[in-house]
Amino acid sequence: MASIPSTGSLIATHDYYRRRIGSTSSNSSCGSSEYAGEVIPHPPGLQRQDSGHWWSSFFFPNKQNQPGGMIGSEQKSGTYTVTNGQVACIAREMVLKKQLSRQLSESSDSGKVEQGSPPPS
C-alpha cells in the first residue's frame, strides 16, 4: 500500500489555504493574477505562515519550519510585525546573540594585559 508523504501533504494543504492578496509575481508558487485579491479562509487547526515561500523554512529552522507561527515568549516579546496583511519575523534573537557575543569578546579582550605595559597595581 502506498502512502502519501506528510511533507507533501502539508505543502499542499498550505498552498490551498494560503492567502493570495494581489501578488504580481509570475512564479506559480507565489500566486497569480487569476487569484488576485482572493482570500482563502484559514483553518483553525493549522498555524499561519508569513509568506508561503518554500525557501523561508531554510532561514528559520528554529521555528519548526513555521516562521509565521507565534510561539511562547516570542508572542509576548513583540518579535513579529504585521505589514500588508502578512506576518514578517524580525530577527531579534540573532541580533541579541550577536550583541552578547560582542560584549563577551570585548570583556575578555579588556582583561588581557598588553605587552610593554606594566600590570595594574
UniProtKB/Swiss-Prot annotation:
Transmembrane segments: none annotated. It holds the Pfam family PPDFL. InterPro entries: PPDPF. Residues 22-47, 101-121 are annotated as: Disordered. Residues 23-33 have a biased composition (Low complexity). It comes from the Eukaryota. Keywords: Developmental protein, Differentiation. Residues 101-110 have a biased composition (Polar residues). One of its GO terms (biological process) is cell differentiation. Probable regulator of exocrine pancreas development. Belongs to the PPDPF family. This is Pancreatic progenitor cell differentiation and proliferation factor. The gene is ppdpf.
